[in-house]
Design a protein with these regions (language model features):
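A positional/architectural concept
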Residues: 1-13, 21
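C-terminal cap/substrate-recognition subdomain and adjoining C-terminal extension
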Residues: 11-16, 24-141
């Protein structure tokens, strides 16, 4: 799947990938199997995780990138430096993201498109091909 290749590209570019989701059953299992940190947000405002991410990952909010598709994502999108959404996000999110709407529907290689956009805009450095291929050999990927 192109999204898992994109996660490896992000990681090999030095970018920490984190799942933050209210859908814990499926996403937590996927994250665990792929060695991706997972935070469950059901019942908690997602922006409350900003301070956790700052201290845990030593990153400032304006350096963070977030992809979301529902109204529950708006509060955290307003606090991070880069907010993106899939093309089938709810209207409020599409309006907020305006120039950052990925031309993919959710679940259709959005992370692959996100990587391409972030790399082309110099938001992230180019990925390290050798590290990428080494990650591909890892049992968890």
């Amino acid at each position: 799947d192109k999204d898992f290749s994109a996660i490896k590209k992000f990681k090999s570019a030095g970018v920490k990938v984190i799942f933050l989701s209210g859908d814990t059953n499926i996403n937590e299992s996927i994250a665990k199997n792929r060695s991706i940190d997972f935070y469950a947000s059901r019942g908690v405002c997602k922006s409350a995780f900003i301070n956790i991410f700052k201290s845990t990952y030593n990153i400032l909010p304006d350096e963070m990138c977030y992809v979301g598709d529902d109204i529950f994502d708006l509060n955290i999108m307003k606090e991070v430096g880069y907010s993106f959404c899939p093309s089938n996000a709810v209207k409020t999110i599409r309006e907020y993201c305006c120039g950052n709407i990925l031309n993919r529907v959710g679940g259709d290689n959005c992370l692959d498109k996100l990587f391409d956009v972030c790399e082309s805009r110099n938001i992230i450095p180019p990925f390290d091909e050798e590290l990428f291929y080494n990650l591909d050999k890892d049992d968890k990927f």
